């Protein structure tokens, strides 16, 4: 199985980009980024090849007997849909990646109030590499199948100057805090509740294939305890919240 890559923070991307530029004698680049709401569920995927549909978690293949929050059972009822998706992509071997979200999977977020559903955010073809969500063909698609695509709601845009990423970090922080306050995906289905954050990938289709350039920004409620520094009172004032999150992003 092809695992979906882990996504780190912006600070890791800054380090990689600067190191690459310095080694090759290049100026630090300016890269346009597109952000999609990060869904707090469990990472999942479906590989379609040789007429088979193999569900997977981030770490292993799944079966109804060895499931992960019922995802394999869900896929067993959607086999024809996933096969059709692969046919529309003219792919002999393709894995659709997404987040399995909904009731009972995670707690304390807006989307936990929804019935369980699969939200696709990427695909992988061994020949073509990673495929962006907007390039996944969905002719005659119906959301009644409880299979969605991450671009069904608006995305976010930011330009990152890797010579001076602070202005971009400020913008990312504002977007992230807004998502945390009210999850846009929960709002789509008339539910209230907090969101987790945003996943950022290069807007350029070719750069987007490089997973080392992807990063995520999480709201304060989803930061690890050790990231909430003792000198910052997280729940006092908006100003302190923003500064704390900017610090964690950079």
Language model features: what each stretch is:
Residues 1-250:
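Core nucleotide-handling region used for phosphoryl-transfer chemistry
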């Amino acid at each position: 199985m092809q695992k979906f890559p882990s996504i780190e923070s912006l600070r890791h991307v800054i380090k990689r980009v600067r190191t690459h530029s310095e080694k090759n004698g290049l100026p630090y680049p300016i890269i346009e980024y597109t952000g999609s709401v990060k869904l707090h569920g469990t990472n999942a995927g479906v590989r379609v090849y040789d007429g088979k549909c193999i569900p997977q978690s981030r770490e292993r293949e799944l079966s109804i007997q060895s499931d992960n929050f019922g995802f394999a059972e869900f896929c067993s009822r959607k086999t024809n849909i996933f096969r059709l998706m692969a046919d529309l992509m003219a792919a002999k071997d393709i894995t659709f990646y997404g987040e399995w979200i909904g009731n009972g999977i995670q707690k304390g977020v807006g989307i936990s109030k929804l019935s369980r559903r699969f939200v696709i955010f990427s695909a992988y073809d061994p020949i073509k590499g990673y495929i962006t969500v907007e390039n996944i063909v969905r002719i005659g698609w119906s959301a009644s199948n409880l299979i969605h695509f991450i671009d069904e709601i608006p995305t976010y845009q930011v330009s990152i100057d890797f010579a001076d990423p602070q202005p971009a970090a400020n913008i990312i922080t504002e977007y992230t805090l807004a998502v945390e306050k009210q999850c846009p995906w929960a709002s789509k289905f008339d539910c209230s509740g907090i969101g987790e954050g945003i996943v950022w990938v290069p807007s350029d289709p070719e750069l987007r294939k490089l997973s080392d350039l992807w990063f995520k920004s999480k709201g304060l409620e989803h930061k690890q305890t050790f990231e909430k520094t003792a000198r910052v009172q997280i729940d006092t004032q908006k100003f302190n919240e923003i500064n704390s999150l900017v610090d964690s992003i950079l």
